[in-house]
């Protein structure tokens, strides 16, 4: 019924677009957002960047590189025998890594812990964006 589309990973300054597919939920949406303090004073300006990103499939074109690089990361981790937590077709990839591998990678790579550190393994998230270069992914893969 409701989902959101992020903007920063495709070059937007900030913000997310909320998509409501169930028209019954639209009835009081503006009032609810305003009531809970989530309405930005000039929030309509955020919509301009999404309007442009959605024109002529630009959002998908910009995001294509990020998704391709994320899939390369996933395939490299799988080839090394690491566990994929979520089989994600997006620019976000989730793995369960041995702590010694995670500790070694964090010296040279940026990623996020996706939960508390376990005794032997920890879940992590790697995220690519429009700015992720092929050579950056090559370097990460070489560290595996």
Question: In which residue ranges do the predicted regions lie?
Answer:
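Active-site C-terminal subdomain of aminotransferase-like
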Residues: 1-90
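Conserved C-terminal alpha-helix-loop-beta "cap" of PLP-dependent enzymes
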Residues: 71, 76-144
